[in-house]
Amino acid sequence: MLGDGKEGTSTIPGFNQIQFEGFYRFIDQGLIEELSKFPKIEDIDHEIEFQLFMETYQLVEPLIKERDAVYESLTYSSELYVSAGLIWKTSRNMQEQRIFIGNIPLMNSLGTSIVNGIYRIVINQILQSPGIYYQSELDHNGISVYTGTIISDWGGRLELEIDKKARIWARVSRKQKISILVLSSAMGSNLREILENVCYPEIFLSFLTDKEKKKIGSKENAILEFYQQFSCVGGDPIFSESLCKELQKKFFHQRCELGRIGRRNINWRLNLNIPQNNIFLLPRDILAAADHLIGMKFGMGTLDDMNHLKNKRIRSVADLLQDQLGLALSRLENVVKGTISGAIRHKLIPTPQNLVTSTPLTTTYESFFGLHPLSQVLDRTNPLTQIVHGRKLSYLGPGGLTGRTANFRIRDIHPSHYGRICPIDTSEGINVGLIGSLSIHARIGDWGSLESPFYELFEKSKKARIRMLFLSPSQDEYFMIAAGNSLALNRGIQEEQAVPARYRQEFLTIAWEEVHLRSIFPFQYFSIGASLIPFIEHNDANRALMSSNMQRQAVPLSRSEKCIVGTGLERQVALDSGVPAIAEHEGKILYTDTEKIVFSGNGDTLSIPLIMYERSNKNTCMHQKPQVRRGKCIKKGQILADGAATVGGELALGKNILVAYMPWEGYNFEDAVLISECLVYGDIYTSFHIRKYEIQTHVTTQGPERITKEIPHLEGRLLRHLDKNGIVMLGSWVETGDILVGKLTPQVAKESSYAPEDRLLRAILGIQVSTSKETCLKLPIGGRGRVIDVRWVQKKGGSSYNPEIIRVYISQKREIKVGDKVAGRHGNKGIISKILPRQDMPYLQDGRPVDMVFNPLGVPSRMNVGQIFECSLGLAGSLLDRHYRIAPFDERYEQEASRKLVFSELYKASKQTANPWVFEPEYPGKSRIFDGRTGDPFEQPVIIGKPYILKLIHQVDDKIHGRSSGHYALVTQQPLRGRSKQGGQRVGEMEVWALEGFGVAHILQEMLTYKSDHIRARQEVLGTTIIGGTIPKPEDAPESFRLLVRELRSLALELNHFLVSEKNFQINRKEV
């Protein structure tokens, strides 16, 4: 992709690679590690022994294809087989069998898993790395208090702190702390060993009193003292085995298991050489940590930055899947133990096959993919969304932070993120800074650290081949890294001058000769979303963040179009998303249609099925269109069919349309957008959406539910689309209220509702007459469209627990309309306020009307000037029939490089097309345009151009909602909230202020009382409004006021009001 001939080339890694590598690591290493931990299981009499032979494990190829798993709502998984042996110790016989342990969901070519027919993805999590961290805080007297925190592999914490008298304590809970001597003795060290292994024995001896000596006189005493302090137990506990086990479980297992990474980190931080396989905290670690803490007190050593990436680790797909396998095998162990003891009790001869069940493993993985916070439904709005979702990094999840507790420091950008985590792409709202995105070239290293690549520069040897290094966050602190992008550095223009560089978390300017490493690619620091923004260096970071989020919300259009101005990454994003169909080897096309492409190659005939109107989980339409003709020869890797939002194998999320930046009668006030009717009639922004409606049939206590066309008491026109089975026919056009599936649920009627002849039959013959209630699937409001698919999924077994499911898929064609949201690639978003006839739109000097009018006031205050560059360059590109791919930070080549490029291209376009208005030197980039209604020119020249505009998934059809009557909340008796609950609007604070401002007291009182939550009065209001007349005044209070009174009563406050008589000033007390 980059680099010149002397250096070799550097290619961008596959965007799904991080998921593939994680899953491969689990299959290759994690599976064997967990199986090898499975213990030998013996019966009570030690006569039978069961064990697994993990060397011979086998994963079988899935029985179904990916597409069938999605269609039939099944899990795309592989069966795991392991050899197991049962040994009879008395006779020394062994029975070995190959047994089925369970199903493990597999990863497909998109880096996702299919569980119960749904695409799911596992997010990578960032956790605090296990190890020891030294920090200092100021106490209430302003004196520094030094602490050392030991974090275990499970996330448990053990704090060491040093007080004014230089005594060292281990804090075991928020309130309890114990002497470090007691802790070391409880872990197995005696006083002589403690004093031999520390650098400051005199400090340890200084706080050793006679009472303390007695406590640590023996290991048993130390354990009892530690247990008393840890569990806050009074009296004198007696030393026992159970007490040791409790302490082991509650304290040592949770807070002292360091794991492989924790052992490495503690060895490195405290200069120890304890073997890597020793994964538990030892007395030596505690004493070395205490020594280091004393050194900190005396001003030696450095404090740790908890937010530095070297102190974080990535919990990848491999770790999460391995944890789940360990959990499943521990459950399996309990099952095997129970089965062995049961077999011996009933005097049965067990076999390995009988002892093992596949349920623990299968259910553990299904519940993990279905319920774990880091396992999410894959967002498939468009191809970009699919890829970006798999590259997310989350601080949230089990063992991590929460949106409420995370402080500003954790959310902020850190210098160590440079080249590893994108400084721009994060979610908005409560999780800002907690969910990040991987930089393009970043990868996960062996120890769970994020690594970034750099080119190593050798002194005086410019001709030598330059080496590429992947550095972890702890390594790159020792190098001077040139911050300039590699394209500029390749040109040799930096060799004489100073360059910006990064060294030990600081950004400096140094001479070129002092540089050790340099970046390999201009986009190295950004994620995929941010790398698709052209001229990103001219935008404010907040707007770039919005843009990278909004590109993921773009709807695939019916006729997509490549962007004129791009960044060059569009092709790789499209290819890695798996949306286009690609030839796996060369051959010749034999046949193509909308459903498949058949081609011959290597002596075989291959058929590639194409995706036809597939629904994504955001209701967008995924569809493939063939791009090759019959008889054509193709090469390996060639695009055979374009998918949704791709054109020619490149990402195409929007359209290049003619835009003017000018005010127009106030219709683009506050970011509103004015558009031409051409965009509607020309199907420029038309998209297809597929909605799924489903219904289940159950077996009730009165009998099974029936799918039928014979539905009593319903109008015939509502049933007109049903076939003989009672299911809607393919290709039907359905409107709101139409029946999609006819269903009857049996129920027993009340005695009073029986007809006289029914009662007679029951009395004479004892026949139970049953009636049925219609529970049909009806098309809800806003669901009109064409039925494109009907699926009847019958689960195996067909019991009441496995109901039959009928799914109906309806396609909608949505043109752009008032209320839809559109956005550019620079965070410039807006809602469509008016659709103007084309003759009323402002038009250019060559007579072309513009397609869209944006508000120019949206640019200066938001500082996203990149849109102006893109707009003007897009106009030049459309006139010259050229496409531009621009790398960021081109100011590195020379000053004002972007502006010079845009102006030079506009000048070329004006000369080539003989249109002088395209580039006018008095106001370059602007042009005089005319009012379509009058034909008069506007006073000021206006910026016109062709930016790339996207239509977003926030569409008015999904948002608009009205309510005439509906449900009320039981407590407040006010309408429910939200479209999904058929809710209504509430007269809130601001509405009350508005009405107060106009002084309409009676209307306000009606709105707040009678019409809102007065149960009787609101029905009377409706009647009097229809008939005419005065609204009767209710005697009692509205429901929300009564609620207030009750809440006050719960606080023991009684609310009463008094009436004072004018005549004799007598107080008549009345209870509310």
From Swiss-Prot:
A Pfam family this chain is assigned to: RNA_pol_Rpb2_2
An annotated GO cellular component: mitochondrion
EC code: 2.7.7.6
Main location (coarse class): plastid
Highest rank taxon of the organism: Eukaryota
Enzyme class: transferase
Compartments where found: Plastid, Chloroplast
Record PROSITE patterns: RNA_POL_BETA (PS01166)
Known catalytic reactions: RNA(n) + a ribonucleoside 5'-triphosphate = RNA(n+1) + diphosphate
InterPro entries the record matches: DNA-dir_RNA_pol_bsu_ext_1_sf, DNA-dir_RNA_pol_su2, DNA-dir_RNAP_su2_dom, DNA-dir_RNAP_su2_hyb_sf, RNA_pol_bsu_bac, RNA_pol_bsu_CS, RNA_pol_Rpb2_2, RNA_pol_Rpb2_2_sf
Gene3D superfamilies, per database record: 2.40.50.100, 2.40.50.150, 3.90.1100.10, DNA-directed RNA polymerase, beta subunit, external 1 domain, DNA-directed RNA polymerase, subunit 2, domain 6, RNA polymerase alpha subunit dimerisation domain, RNA polymerase Rpb2, domain 2
Ranges in coiled-coil conformation: none
Alphabetical GO biological process terms: DNA-templated transcription
CDD domains, alphabetized: RNA_pol_B_RPB2
GO molecular function, one term: ribonucleoside binding
Keywords: Chloroplast, DNA-directed RNA polymerase, Nucleotidyltransferase, Plastid, Transcription, Transferase
Keyword Ligase: no
Classification via HAMAP family: RNApol_bact_RpoB
Family in the record: Belongs to the RNA polymerase beta chain family.
Function: DNA-dependent RNA polymerase catalyzes the transcription of DNA into RNA using the four ribonucleoside triphosphates as substrates.
PANTHER family with a match to the protein in the record: DNA-DIRECTED RNA POLYMERASE I SUBUNIT 2 (PTHR20856)
Subunit structure: In plastids the minimal PEP RNA polymerase catalytic core is composed of four subunits: alpha, beta, beta', and beta''. When a (nuclear-encoded) sigma factor is associated with the core the holoenzyme is formed, which can initiate transcription.
Name of this chain's protein: DNA-directed RNA polymerase subunit beta
Gene field: rpoB
